[in-house]
Amino acid sequence: MSDVVLSAVPTPFAADGSLDLAGARRLFGFVAGVVDGLFVTGTTGEFPALDDDERLSLIETALSVAGPDRVIAHIGAPDAYRAARLAAAAVSLGATRIAAITPFYLAPSPTEVASYYLRIREAAPSAGLYAYIFPERTGVTVTPSQFCELADEVGLAGAKFSGAAALNVAACATARPSLRIFSGDDSDLAATLRAAGAGIISARSSAFPEVFAGLSAALRAAGAGKAPDASVTAAARQADVTAIAALGSSIGLVKEALRLRGFGPMGARMPVGFPDPATAARVGELVKSLAPAD
């Protein structure tokens, strides 16, 4: 796989909270046309507020517009029973890569975390399975040594480390170089790559895919020595990423930017931190300056 920038795409909802599947198809197609792939029905996709049929409909939509090799379908749940059923269903739809956040709400032991992933592996043996570690959202901390043990026992293909866990990307990627370790921190792609990470799974790239794809391309060209001005371009794109990151990391900010880019109301079911008027104005300024006019 050569994916470096995967977008953790939000789920479009109508103003009344109903799922906007047609809007999802349009959004997924747009983002997939710019970045390397999609991470669907994850945290940014408000997965706790989706029923199983809705999650599978969104996964099927992503697979149809981006292709199986460019989609990681998140099927994580609080319990192994539901996650395993979703995993099997996603694979039946054509998914070749699945991810699961650690079980949450009731605090699991490391043994229970491993059991959860083994149940998913048994339900979907042909799929590449990625652990999703996000302690701030789950209350589950997985140390680098625990992750390596988990990866070996379950046969993981990789992982996404978000929040405080993103600090463990270097340790885990170095200890298990055959795995694809992604960071959920999209503020410094170059640092992730220097730490031996595979790349980023980025919420903000859903709204500004051109910026993140441009940064990735410039870093690749600079590393290969193919373009004398690539380092200058990379620095400029990183400055754009820094400006985007300065707004904050809420899902509501991403949805506001997409709304301004013409992707419908981009409503939400969960409290996603929609911006206040002053912040919304700053989002609008960035959209005008960084997003190509359609």
Where are the language model's segments positioned?
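Helix N-cap/beta->alpha junction signal
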Residues: D79, D185-D186, D276
